């Protein structure tokens, strides 16, 4: 008997979204380059965030420190509709 896949095709898959981060930057009238400078992160990390790719938790913490916010203010887990 074959085991069923842990990720059945009918199940919803989840992914990280950084939309909240971009909305927060707009609210604070900051540009991505300003965030990179203030949080001391690279433009490559900003680009990864823009593509909703995984980044090191240290980067997320630096962003939160720079923006004086919580991790839940800059990211969320959403259903992957792709």
Residue locations for each model-derived region?
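Short, basic-rich loop-to-helix N-cap that marks the start of a DNA-contacting helix
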Residues: 52-65
